[in-house]
């Protein structure tokens, strides 16, 4: 049976889900795990508040319990439900924010985050504190745009370019797109600011592929013994 990586968008936005799928599509290739992208139908339109963040943990757990996969990605850049979901599966579970931070630190000493809203900042700061890397953050700039504006092919781009350039001026050597709704704007933002721009769902897929393919190698070695 083909290996499967399941990306779960915890919000109910179809445009956000479609953007995630398009962003990770280049990572699908013969011989690699299949990438499936789904959304939580009963989820909020976006993960904005702490209530959204905490409330979505149980629906995420239920989906992981009923959907078999070789790895899971919780496709929101505040990593909601990460600890809870890890208790209901023995498969690897990835948070895009943590994966993006790891990727950013491989590209430079300091990074910046373009956040979804002001309310995103405390949740992302908590994750950075848990990772012990808060001092590597050059700054965070929120866009404060609605999800459906953020996922529009053109509407948020002037603001994204402005925010990315401001983060570079603050000392960022790479920039993280701090919402999965920004997934379709990575190339544009990188061209605008001149430093590496990390799309977190792509970073998480790269780590998930590594985990799944490594496990494949372990199984083949055990079978040969």
Report each predicted region and the residues it spans.
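Active-site rim beta-loop-alpha module in soluble metabolic enzymes
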Residues: 119-178
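Periplasmic-binding protein-like
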Residues: 7-8, 70-76, 172-179
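N-terminal beta1-alpha1 ligand-phosphate binding loop
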Residues: 3-28
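Short, hydrophobic alpha-helical segments
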Residues: 208-216
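Short, acidic/small-residue loops that bind anionic groups at enzyme active sites
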Residues: 86-107, 189-208
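Conserved beta-strand elements of the Class I
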Residues: 6-8, 111-114
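N-terminal beta-loop-helix "entrance" segment that forms/cooperates
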Residues: 37-61, 148-153
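Short, well-structured alpha-helical segments in soluble
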Residues: 54-69, 157-171
């Amino acid at each position: 049976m083909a290996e499967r990586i399941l990306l779960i968008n915890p919000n109910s936005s179809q445009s956000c889900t479609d953007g995630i799928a398009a962003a990770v599509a280049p990572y699908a290739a013969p011989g690699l795990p299949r990438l499936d992208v789904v959304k939580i139908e009963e989820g909020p339109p976006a993960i904005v508040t702490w209530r959204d963040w905490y409330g979505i943990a149980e629906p995420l757990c239920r989906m992981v319990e009923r959907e078999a996969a070789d790895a899971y990605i919780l496709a929101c850049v505040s990593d909601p439900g990460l600890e809870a979901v890890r208790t209901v599966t023995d498969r690897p579970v990835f948070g895009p924010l943590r994966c993006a931070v790891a990727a950013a630190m491989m590209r430079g000493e300091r990074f910046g985050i373009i956040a979804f809203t002001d309310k995103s900042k405390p949740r992302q700061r908590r994750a950075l504190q848990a990772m012990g890397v808060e001092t590597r953050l050059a700054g965070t700039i929120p866009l404060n745009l609605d999800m459906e504006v953020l996922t529009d092919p053109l509407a948020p781009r002037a603001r994204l370019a402005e925010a990315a350039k401001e983060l570079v001026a603050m000392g960022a050597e790479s920039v993280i797109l701090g919402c999965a709704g920004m997934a379709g704007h990575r190339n544009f933002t990188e061209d605008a600011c001149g430093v590496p721009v990390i799309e977190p769902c792509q970073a998480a897929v790269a780590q998930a592929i590594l985990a799944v393919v490594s496990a494949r190698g372990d199984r083949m070695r055990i079978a040969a013994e």
